[in-house]
Amino acid sequence: DHRDLHTAYRRQRQMCIRDRYRASYAGVKIRLNVRGVCCLQPDLKKISKNIKVTSIVDRYLEHSRIFSFYNNGKPKVYISSADLMERSFDRRVELAIEVKDADSKNKIQEILKISLKDNIQSYILESDGTYIRSKPSKGSKKIRAQSYFHRSAVKNAGKIATISEDAFTPHKPKTKNFGTAV
């Protein structure tokens, strides 16, 4: 029954929010960069005072699905196909994988840090559900995450072009009948 699925999703969403509130209450600092709707209320005394939610609205419809946690002071980084939307819980098969390669982990953490430092195109979710546009504080560096990533991609494009062409050449099987109907 569709109503049962909707009820299950609502419970799942409430559990996700409740778990973040519990972590905040225990003193865990939580930073969320959410592209769309966010049902969580940040900055409520005793409940979510350690939670900050930002949203970047800019040129690209880009939204990395990065999850970064510190466990006993050690970072654990995951990338995922899922967001925390109804469709991901009810109608899709999604996955999250831990990034173990040190270089990849560092690059992904850099993406997350730059995104959370954006003070040009980011908006901060207030406890009443309104968003306030970020502004750089006087004398601080202006950071626009998508411009930073664009410049970085253009700069690195030249390096990528020098990779050997044969590194990406597909190999055909040595079978006579490959690709023909029998």
Task: Please report, for each region that a protein language model flagged, where it lies by residue.
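HKD (HxKxxxxD) catalytic microenvironment of the phospholipase D
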Residues: 55-134
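HKD-type phospholipase D/PLD-like phosphodiesterase module
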Residues: 33-70
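Flexible, glycine-rich loop/tail regions that form catalytic "lids" or insertion modules at the edges
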Residues: 11-14, 41-42, 49, 103-182
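Phosphate-centric recognition/catalysis
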Residues: 27
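Hydrophobic anchor at the start of a short beta-strand
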Residues: 30
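Short helix/loop capping segments that flank catalytic or ligand/cofactor-binding pockets
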Residues: 18, 41-42, 87-89
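Single conserved hydrophobic/aromatic residue that forms the stacking wall/gate
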Residues: 1-13, 17
